[in-house]
Amino acid sequence: MVNVLDKVQPKNKTQLKRLIDYAFNHNIYDLNFIDTSKITNMSNLFMNCEYDIDVSNWDVSNVTTTFCMFVGCKKFNSDLSNWNMANVKNMNNMFYCCKNFDCDLSNWNVSNVTDMYSMFTACENFKGKGLENWDVSKAEDMRYMFYNCKNFNCDLSNWDMSKALRINEMFYGCKKFEGKGLENWKLEKTLFYYDMFTGCDKVKLPSWYKAFLKRCNLEFF
């Protein structure tokens, strides 16, 4: 039996998944006894997990993908503020439908991330604490990033959107979002904008979005 007072170091994702399953089978939800420093792939790791787990002290410094890592983890709200995300490139669907999640992510280095598709979709409790100064200068796909984040309201004026190609439905259904700072965005490569602010009644549409609507002969509802 694993002694949770000792660190256990899996060499790959398969071994890590076995350790997690073992812990859950023994009603162990504090997973900080696992040394994850050798893991590079954490995709789909906790999909539809029903437990309130603690992974706050995990070493993710070598991880390159967190694709669908916490999809459907409705109770998940572990403190991830000190995670080193410097090598992650893919955060696609990372917190999809984590309805309880509302962690301060101000310390995250996301400067190498290119894919943020649907990253926080349906995170109904997520307010966006700490995202103000994220370096998203390499992000290309931001579709549905905050889709139906009903409590999201963050000032994103400092975001470098120069590489963003797809941002359609990015803030769809963000009822409390006021759109602070969006006028400052320079969208040099963006191809897809549609339905970006649908359901965002508090947003004053930035000029670049109005220009898009005009080009497409559309109206904002």
Model-derived segments and their meaning:
Residues M1-F221:
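Negatively charged
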